């Protein structure tokens, strides 16, 4: 998993609430278990017209000014609906590494941290201020400093990022569950060797 670093990036505005996982990545694209290749299908039903090929000019993220954005600013209750890890996979594969909302579905929120994606919870007033700044200056860049737990904007907004210390360390170190386990490989091996002596029948 790629380590999360301090960055200053374009903040893309998608002012929609209750965006569920089926809207993030429709079910017809859940046909593989690799984490890559889902970005092209992100928000598919909104991004493309009925022919499934032509970009929808009315969809927010299709604006050229948001090209290359790493920060997604969106409405309340993001990531609700059925549980599917493909949702954060698609968001990360598209190029985002940060999602800002007032609230996230619990399972989606947890899955973000396992996929190098930082979900930032803000108050309704803070979200309104961020959205207003983007609307007034589309293409504006925000700075996210996870180590300092701070989000800043050119307009003077400063927001404290509330994040669990373990999850923060995982993102900064690029450590998913497997990587955390491998950090204790020596202890695991020692335990196994001891168990082979005390409970040999388990290893037959």
UniProtKB/Swiss-Prot annotation:
It comes from the Bacteria. It is an enzyme of class 4 (lyase). Its EC number is 4.2.1.33. The keyword Flavoprotein does not apply. One of its GO terms (molecular function) is 3-isopropylmalate dehydratase activity. It catalyses: (2R,3S)-3-isopropylmalate = (2S)-2-isopropylmalate. InterPro entries: 3-IsopropMal_deHydase_ssu, Aconitase/3IPM_dehydase_swvl, AconitaseA/IPMdHydase_ssu_swvl, IPMI_Swivel, LeuD. PANTHER family: 3-ISOPROPYLMALATE DEHYDRATASE SMALL SUBUNIT (PTHR43345:SF5), 3-ISOPROPYLMALATE DEHYDRATASE SMALL SUBUNIT 2-RELATED-RELATED (PTHR43345). This is 3-isopropylmalate dehydratase small subunit.
């Amino acid at each position: 998993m790629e380590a999360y670093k301090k960055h200053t990036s374009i903040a893309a505005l998608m002012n929609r609430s209750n965006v569920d996982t089926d809207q993030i990545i429709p079910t017809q694209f859940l046909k593989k278990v690799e984490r890559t290749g889902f970005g092209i299908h992100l928000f598919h039903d909104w991004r493309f017209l009925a022919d499934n090929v032509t970009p929808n000019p009315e969809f927010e993220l299709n604006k050229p000014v948001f090209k290359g954005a790493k920060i997604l600013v969106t409405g309340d209750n993001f990531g609700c609906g059925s549980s599917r890890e493909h949702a954060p996979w698609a968001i990360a594969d598209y190029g985002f590494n940060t999602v800002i909302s007032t609230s996230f579905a619990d399972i989606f929120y947890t899955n973000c941290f396992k996929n190098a994606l930082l979900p930032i919870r803000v108050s309704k007033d803070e979200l309104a201020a961020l959205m207003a700044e983007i609307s007034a200056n589309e293409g504006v860049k925000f700075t996210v400093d996870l180590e300092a737990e701070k989000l800043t904007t050119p307009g003077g907004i400063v927001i404290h990022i509330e994040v669990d210390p373990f999850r923060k360390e995982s993102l900064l170190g690029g450590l998913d569950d497997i990587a955390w386990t491998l950090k204790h490989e020596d202890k695991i091996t020692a335990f196994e060797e001891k168990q082979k002596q005390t409970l040999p029948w388990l290893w037959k």
